[in-house]
Amino acid sequence: MKDRLIEFGYAAGWRLVRVLPLSVARRLFMAAADRAYAANGPGTQRLRRNLQQIVPDMPDLLVRAGLRSYARYWLEAFRLPTQSRQQLLAGLGMSDENFAELKSLIADGRGVVLALPHVGNWDAAAAWVVSHGWPMVTVAERLKPEGVFEQFVAYREKLGMEVLPLTGGRRPPLDVLAERLQQGIVVALLGDRDLSRGGVEVSFFGGRTRMPAGPAILAIRTGAPLIAVDLSFTPTKTWAVLRRITPATEGALDVRVKATTQLLADAFAQGIADHPQDWHMLQKLWL
């Protein structure tokens, strides 16, 4: 019964937010974020500790700003399927230089690995990619209950991307992703939190954590370009900054994967430090 209620809650949220006027929905979501800040529950406390790792002398209002940013992600994510192609394209911006580089790399036909932390609105970024006519594949954590996972998969497939389960699929996701890169398809992966317990240990904001090895392995094995993507919120859209990563070439594969993952961690840190309020990390990260 609990699982059914959770599934119903997500489904109702998706439907309700889509039909509400944006101004009304925004007020509701910001009020919910402020209530979460005042309640100071486990997620809020964890966000505070994570932000203190980044900004040791931070004002506590940064936590409130972080919760509001997270609420904005959910508000926008729920409403994405109702938007037109032109609205999806207008919802994300980047510099002309970054756009030209990305377009050129995709046109080369070797695929592109886009790795990013949990920042800004990654679903809006994915929708922007596929709205350009560039096929894209990603991996989704198998959430519980199963019905919620299926809703998230259906939601992202409706936006135009292929979604592979992190676990429980017919084939290992890395094998499928490597094939997709060889077909010239864009691979997008969240890369700041390891879910497999087999991640690479890296230095991150003065502490040690583990990050998934997948982006580095794919880039090294296939030769596909590797890009660290930084996303942040402006008043009207998501803004992207692309940082090209050159994979390590010296040593055994595990040595190169570790060094390349550290380069990604450094690039992630650079972006997060610029806008810590837009990093949606409400889980334990550091070892």
Can you say where each PLM-predicted feature lies in the sequence?
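Membrane-anchoring hydrophobic helices of lipid-metabolizing enzymes
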Residues: M1-L116, F149, V153, G160
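Soluble or luminal CAZymes and related metallo-dependent hydrolases
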Residues: F8, G43, M94, G169, ...
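Non-catalytic C-terminal accessory region of glycerolipid acyltransferases
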Residues: A36, I54-D60, R64, S104-I106, ...
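Active-site metal-coordination segments of metallo-dependent hydrolases
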Residues: Q45-R46, P145-E146, T209-P212
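A conditional alpha-helix N-cap/helix-loop micro-motif detector
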Residues: G91-D96, H118-V119, P145, T167-R171, ...
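Conserved beta-strand termini and adjacent loop/short-helix elements that scaffold enzyme active sites
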Residues: E97, V139-E141, L166, R243-I245, ...
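Short amphipathic alpha-helical segments and helix-helix/interface helices
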Residues: F99-K103, A126, F152-V153, L177-A178, ...
